[in-house]
Amino acid sequence: MSKVLFVKANDRPAEQAVSSKMYETFVSTYKEANPNTEITELDLFALDLPYYGNIAISGGYKRSQGMELTAEEEKAVATVDQYLNQFLEADKVVFAFPLWNFTVPAPLITYISYLSQAGKTFKYTANGPEGLAGGKKVVVLGARGSDYSSEQMAPMEMAVNYVTTVLGFWGITNPETVVIEGHNQYPDRSQQIVEEGLEKVKKVAAKF
């Protein structure tokens, strides 16, 4: 039985946030097509994950050197391990998030920091870093109110580009990506843009 991990990084309701609607649409379509799959859903805002900083980094380093950890470090390292191992054990992963101020919401950056661990999702070699998580099937669902398809706007898109770059660093070089964009910039076509995008989401979910 496949293990599927759904990761949502938006705390706004679906009627107000397109990426939340994409997430709900994907999950419901997938569950309908795969009723016996083992599914885990992570709502990153609800989890309120501690920032990845000195305590977790020092704890991880000290553990790798066989040094004694403080209670705080033990807790931080255990939290990182929990989500890292969950990700590594998943056969399929879906990320859903908006573009806010040119990038992803902060909880997703924290979560990705937990996962990006040398020796786990990538390793260092003489020829440069090498990804270790390439066997996963991954879908990236992104929404952005403006149209970033132009030559002028494309470099400012640091949400989907950020996530797919990190995935590639981990060896996941072929994630399937569905983006809904421009629904705020083009209000006269907003409903059509969203509806067409959600149809794409359904198709991807049905065959995932």
Curated annotation (Swiss-Prot):
Q: Which InterPro entries match?
A: Flavodoxin_fold, Flavoprotein-like_sf, FMN-dep_NADH:Q_OxRdtase_AzoR1, NADH:quinone_OxRdtase_FMN_depd
According to its UniProt record, which reaction does this protein catalyse? 2 a quinone + NADH + H(+) = 2 a 1,4-benzosemiquinone + NAD(+); N,N-dimethyl-1,4-phenylenediamine + anthranilate + 2 NAD(+) = 2-(4-dimethylaminophenyl)diazenylbenzoate + 2 NADH + 2 H(+)
Q: How is the cofactor bound?
A: Binds 1 FMN per subunit.
* EC id: 1.6.5.-, 1.7.1.17
GO molecular function: any one? Answer: oxidoreductase activity, acting on NAD(P)H as acceptor
Which keywords does UniProt give here?
Answer: Flavoprotein, FMN, NAD, Oxidoreductase
Going by the record, the broad EC class of this enzyme is oxidoreductase
| Span of the signal peptide | none
- Name the needed cofactors: FMN
**Pfam families registered for this protein in UniProt:** Flavodoxin_2 (PF02525)
The role this protein plays is: Quinone reductase that provides resistance to thiol-specific stress caused by electrophilic quinones.
* Family membership: Belongs to the azoreductase type 1 family.
List the NCBIfam families hit by this protein, alphabetically: PRK13555.1, PRK13556.1
Can you state the subunit structure given in the record? Homodimer.
Protein name per the record: FMN-dependent NADH:quinone oxidoreductase 2
Identify the species of origin.
Bacillus cereus (strain ATCC 10987 / NRS 248)
